[in-house]
Structure formats: C-alpha cells, structure tokens
Amino acid sequence: MFNNKLSRRRFLGNFAFTSAAIATGSGSWVIRPDWANAAERLIKLGIATDLTGPLGYAGKADANVARMVVKEINDAGGLLGRPVELLIEDTASNESVAVGNVRKLIQREKVDMVLGGITSSMRNAIKDVIVARGKTLYIYPQLYEGKECTPYLFCTGPTPAQQCDEFIPWLIKNGGKRFALPSANYVWPHTLNVYARKVIESNGGEVIFEEYYPLDQIDFSSTVSRIISNKVDVVFNTVIPPGVGPFFKQLYEAGFLKNGGRLSCVYYDENTLNVNQANEIEGLASCLDYFKALTPEDPASAKIQAAYEKQFPGNFLFAAGSAATGTYRGLKLWEAAVKEAGKVDRDSVAAALDHAKIAEGPGGPAEMVPGKHHCKMKMYTAVAKGGNYDIVARSAGLVDPKEC
C-alpha cells in the first residue's frame, strides 16, 4: 500500500497517482510503500516523463503504469527483499526543464535506474545526464526511429523494422502505392522516413512527397491541397500533437477518406483516437505492439488492462503509442534483471538486462536481443472503426528490432 499523506497538494486534472504521492517540489513526486522504514535500504526508481505540455496525456499514463508495477512489486515483498521507492519528475515537453529535473533524480536522489522520455529529442536531451555524467542505467520506453546504441541505454518500444517491414506492404495492398509523408520537423520523423521510404519503394510503392513542419503548426491547408491534387493513396503521417488533430480534420473535410484515401500513423493508439471525431479518422491504420482489442484473446493482456483501468479510471489510457506498454515492459524486464543480478549496481543489472525475458506482457512475451539493447516483441496492425480498433494483421511471432 502507498502512503496517502501529501506534504504539498498539487493536482493535475485527473492525474491519478498524485493523490497517493508526496510532492517534494514543483513537478516532483515520491511514492514509497508504507512498510519502508529507516532500517530498509530503498531501491530507487526514477521516472522522467511529460506530465504537462502537449504530450502530457501520454506521460500521465506512463507514470500511472510505473505506479501500478511498483505497487505490484512492493505488495509482493519488494525487490531482493527491499522496498522500491518511485520518484517521478515532470519533463514538461520541454527539454531544458527536463534536463534540470532529471539532474535531480541523478544527483540529489541518486536513483538506481531512470525510465522515461517520450520524444526522441527528449531522449537525446536527457541521456547524457543519466548515462555519461550520471553513471546510471536508462530505459527508453517509446517507439522511435532506431539507431540508439548508447551503452547502458536500453529501448523497450518498437523500432522502424518492427513497425514498417510488415505494415507498409499491408498499406500498399489495402490502400495503394502512392504515399505522402507529412511530418513533424524533428529527429524521429526524419529518421523513420528514411527507413519507411526504402520499404515503400522496395515493395513497389512511390513517395509522392515528403514534407516537414514546425511542431506547433496547425494550418495544413497547403499540404491537404497537395495530397488531394496529387491523388495520394496513403498518408503515412508523423505529424504529432498539437498539429495532428487539425491536420486529420482538414484532410477529412477535403474528402480524402470519402474518396478512398488511407490514413496511417504508427503511434496512433487508444489515447490518440480521442484527438478527433471518430468519423474524421475512420479507417486509419496503425502498427503497434498492443491494442486493447487483443484482450478477449489474450488473458495476460486482459489482466494487465483490467488492473490499470481499476486503479486509474479516466482519460489517460493504457496504450502502446503513448509508451505505456513500453513502460510496463521496461519495468518488468528491469525487475527480472535485478532478481537475476542479486544487486542493483549499474553494471550487474545491465549485464542481466542484456538477455532479460518476460513470458507475459501487453501484447505477448518480450525479450531483449543480447548485445543489441532492444526488444523482440509481437506486432499488430489495427484499423480504426467507430472509435475503436479492429486487429487486421499480426506478426507470426516475436519481431526482431534489427538495431545496433
């Protein structure tokens, strides 16, 4: 059980865990089990994620997942017989703020591991503070563009190979060969599009145009006109919030879907379904490691989903594109590694994490590829229908990330 006393009250909408946390400063929370006492040597787990800013919906879900997993660990007696203390810092969708707050986790709190970061630009901003300067293990839970091979940094979200190799051929078969790549102007879209273009062209498709926009752009009238006038079949989107909602709405109003166009977006999940009216994204295709639609057929996924919804009812959903599944996977792999290592120092845990496996998780089992610092996992293609997703394709087994 968690301490319910607040030393300072700070409420962020319906951010579920704040009512059970000790707020230790602006954007800082500590969650400690009641059975922890001065005689116990705490294992300190740091979470650095966007609780505020445009990606706050994702960060709040990720922090809730961390709270759920740590509660399970502590209710079972902790790790190595020691309580796990959860320390959460707001990266605020702002890299300069994030660096300062992550530095607190490393220098002041001396955490044993940090998990977090949503965008790749955020990961790049905080990884040096954690790994190089802080000599601390770092787990990055979000789907991303690949090519992150920093020592002591482990990735537990999907890579371009996992999201594109089977998904793009499906799009060509179920959408068409003429692709547009409208994109936010930062590292993830730029690097992902290089990979996506190769897969499109090697499967007989064609990239009609590839464009990049400021992250805060909300007027896409010229882009929509270009899509319509060039008879684009498939929009392979990497525009992110706050721009993605207006973009999809403008595309819908221009008749793209009505005229047979296919929307696709590899980070779209149950959280982002709520960005637009259901009819504005009907038929949108996504490829992720988990969708809630899997729960009727997968008891392990159903159990995880139900536990999350019981503890955290509200608008911040357990969803893959928001890194909630990567957060769950990362924490369970870390737990397995600590148990194997029998200690929490960086080198020992990293050596065990390098080959860690979990038999059950959202979407299925997962395992680190030895020497590669990335996960094999199952992948699913789903299509938006009436405000939910239908699974339309799935990998035959665990998909190799093909990284490092």
Identify the role of each PLM range.
Residues S28-T49:
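C-terminal segment of N-terminal export signals and the immediately downstream linker at the start
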Residues Q107, V111-Y212, G261-S286:
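Extracytoplasmic ligand/sensor domains, especially the bilobed periplasmic-binding protein
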Residues V69-L79:
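Flexible, small-residue-rich helix->loop connector segments that border functional cores
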Residues M1-R10, N14-T24, P33:
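N-terminal secretory signal peptides
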Residues K310-A324, L331-I391:
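Segments of small-molecule ligand-sensing domains
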Residues G46-R67, E89-E95, I118, P182-H190, ...:
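Extracytoplasmic "Venus flytrap"
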Residues L251-Y328, S395-K402:
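Extracellular/periplasmic periplasmic-binding protein-like sensory domains
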Residues Y57-N64, G77-K147, T156, P214-F220, ...:
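Beta-alpha junction/loop-to-helix N-cap segments that form part of ligand/metal-binding clefts
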